[in-house]
Amino acid sequence: KEMLRKAKGAQSALAITEELKAGKAAPKKARAAPSYYRRRKPKWYERFRWFYSSDGFLILGGRDADSNEEIYGKYLERRDLAMHTDAPGALFTVIKTEGKEVPESTLQEAAVFSVSYSSLWKGGLAAADCYLVKGGQVSKTPEPGEFLKKGAFVIRGERRYFRDVPFGIALGIRDGALIGGPVSAIKPGSDPAVEIEPGELNADDLAKRIYRQFSERVGDRAFLKSIASVDQIVQFLPPGNSRIKAT
């Protein structure tokens, strides 16, 4: 009987070994969290307004006068492009070209970014104008007798105007981070995502609604709160009242 029991045990061990070889009974391992649920380290540009265009160009925007000055002083190169509006409180927008030709699609997205994150958002309009210049045309040297406020610049030379640029942005989660910017650059590849337009809700109330909508799609609430809390969502919203666009 002892020999028979050992023989059966050997047969059972052999069967398990064969199953492992065939991939039928792989040893259990701790499942790695999907990349979607991994919070990544913040990038240097995330202290500004920013997004990557659908063509892969990094676009920066100042949050206030101090960050406008920092972008100009540290990150604007002559080979870059800059966008601005004529309205007070305008976003200083920089397209980091890396010496490459910038497609029209990126310019259009940068224009939407520039007007949507400016004070024009709260003006009750559906669209606004902005203009494009080369990095070398932007200066902090005023004309004789003039004075420049902090965050303001002098633009010299020709400007290319973008007329009737529509307002509208999207917020979404992609690669473990909350992102925001033009719909065409943000919504594809982001899950969840929402579109924002000028409306009746203040930033805090809208951020709470966005958070609730995101929480319906993201099962890991701790992860969601770590990258897209209400306060973090507020940082991606334009100035002035807004609402979630019906889609």
Please place each PLM-identified region on the residue numbering.
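Extended, highly charged segments
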Residues: K1-T247
